[in-house]
């Protein structure tokens, strides 16, 4: 995978990714645009036989924490384009190929505005019907998509896949098991911010700096679940050099004050939340879904047998997700 750029001219690392633009098929168009003074890197996916004089429904796709547009976000953007949608998958500000210093800053306000930035770009396209724009967020991108949709009503239909409540986990720990160390970790974050003033950037992350053999052994030592699967996906099978699984330690200051569940009642758009029935992150989707009291059109859809990360790549689960998204966006856009 070190030579992934040679394998795919667009740097895409997901299965069955576009390798060239062919007439009569979905095409990919790398684009850049400015958001809050930063150049954002995005991939636009155009449906087969795209005609710029026609009007299309569109979907913005937000990538997981620690990920990039060339991974699962690109997979689902391509799948939705195959269904006839114009789609966009953009790298978050400070992450991937998008600008921003320090690298890998992970502020919720930025991630939320990144989604609005994708909507901005789609709205400027003459071929997009502005009344038919939806959003799909995956993992952390799912949490930020629900947060964005609470107030950005240009989003007409909201979908999440394996939603991850970044603020809750950074604050309480995974499965809410680190509540007793909240203050200690806040002090650690404050100290990291002080170090940033001196030019030293401190990072947190789940992907250790190891070669393939070492990483495989480390992965095999972990219990089944999100982090073991995450190393397989991000560190081995679908790795990308800009998807490090890391974020600045100083980001904790902002992350720990954020919670997806806050103001979920402001979502009045159609809402679809998809998760694997065996995902150890399922509690986050269920809790957020329960608080989405402002919409009468909502559904929690479980992919039987799937774990969190398996919804990113396992063909049988991806197919079920795409079929559900086909129905949801077809009915609501």
Regions found by a protein language model. Give the residues of each.
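Short beta-strand/loop motif that positions the catalytic acidic residue
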Residues: 267, 273-275
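Catalytic histidine-centered segment of alpha/beta-hydrolase-like enzymes
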Residues: 306-318
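Alpha/beta-hydrolase-fold enzymes
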Residues: 146-231
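N-terminal cap/lid segment of alpha/beta-hydrolase-fold proteins
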Residues: 6-54
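Short beta-strand element of the alpha/beta-hydrolase
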Residues: 54-64
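Conserved alpha/beta-hydrolase
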Residues: 79-99
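The serine-hydrolase catalytic nucleophile loop
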Residues: 66-78, 92, 285
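Alpha/beta-hydrolase active-site loop
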Residues: 105-126
């Amino acid at each position: 995978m070190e030579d992934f750029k040679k394998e795919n001219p667009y740097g895409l690392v997901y299965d069955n990714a576009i390798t060239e633009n062919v007439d009569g098929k979905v095409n990919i168009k790398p684009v850049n645009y400015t958001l809050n003074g930063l150049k954002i890197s995005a991939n636009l996916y155009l449906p087969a036989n795209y005609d710029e004089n026609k009007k299309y429904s569109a979907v913005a796709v937000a990538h997981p924490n620690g990920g990039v547009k060339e991974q699962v976000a690109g997979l689902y953007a391509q799948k939705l384009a195959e269904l006839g949608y114009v789609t966009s998958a953009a790298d978050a500000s400070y992450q991937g190929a998008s600008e921003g210093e320090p690298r890998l800053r992970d502020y919720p306000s930025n991630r939320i505005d990144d989604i609005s930035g994708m909507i901005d770009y789609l709205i400027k396209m003459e071929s997009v019907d502005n009344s038919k724009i939806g959003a799909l967020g995956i993992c952390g991108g799912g949490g930020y998509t629900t947060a964005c949709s609470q107030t950005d009503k240009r989003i007409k239909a909201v979908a999440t896949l394996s939603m991850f409540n970044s603020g809750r986990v950074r604050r309480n720990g995974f499965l809410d098991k680190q509540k007793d160390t909240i203050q200690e970790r806040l002090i650690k974050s404050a100290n990291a911010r002080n170090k940033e003033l001196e030019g030293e950037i401190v990072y947190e992350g789940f992907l250790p700096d190891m070669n393939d053999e070492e990483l495989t052994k480390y992965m095999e030592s972990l219990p089944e679940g999100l982090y073991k699967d995450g190393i397989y996906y991000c560190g081995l099978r679908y790795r990308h050099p800009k998807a490090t699984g890391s974020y600045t330690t100083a980001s904790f200051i902002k992350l720990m004050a954020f919670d997806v569940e806050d103001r979920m009642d402001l979502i009045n758009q159609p809402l679809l939340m998809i998760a694997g029935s065996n995902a150890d992150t399922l509690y986050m989707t269920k809790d957020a879904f329960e608080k989405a009291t402002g919409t009468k059109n909502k559904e929690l859809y479980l992919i039987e047998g799937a774990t969190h990360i398996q919804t990113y790549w396992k063909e049988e689960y991806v197919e079920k997700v795409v079929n559900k998204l086909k129905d949801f966006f077809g009915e609501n856009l």
